[in-house]
Amino acid sequence: MAVQQNKPTRSKRGMRRSHDALTAVTSLSVDKTSGEKHLRHHITADGYYRGRKVIAK
């Protein structure tokens, strides 16, 4: 089993965790037909993708 030789400093711990923060979703697209907002490269809630119906409900 691996055991650390020395305790990592607060600085090293902070540098390791510097990329762990969550970021807000900033790029929402608007559907051409319904005007609904959705994530890029995802279908809308009513089944449209790039202006076409891809899932029939």
Curated annotation (Swiss-Prot):
This is Large ribosomal subunit protein bL32. Pfam families: Ribosomal_L32p (PF01783). Part of the 50S ribosomal subunit. Contacts L17. It comes from Escherichia coli (strain K12). NCBIfam families: rpmF_bact. Keywords: Ribonucleoprotein, Ribosomal protein. Residues 1-38 are annotated as: Disordered. Belongs to the bacterial ribosomal protein bL32 family. Coiled coil: none annotated. One of its GO terms (cellular component) is cytosolic large ribosomal subunit. It comes from the Bacteria. The keyword Transit peptide does not apply. HAMAP family: Ribosomal_bL32 (MF_00340). GO terms for biological process: cytoplasmic translation; response to radiation; response to reactive oxygen species; ribosomal large subunit assembly. The keyword rRNA-binding does not apply.
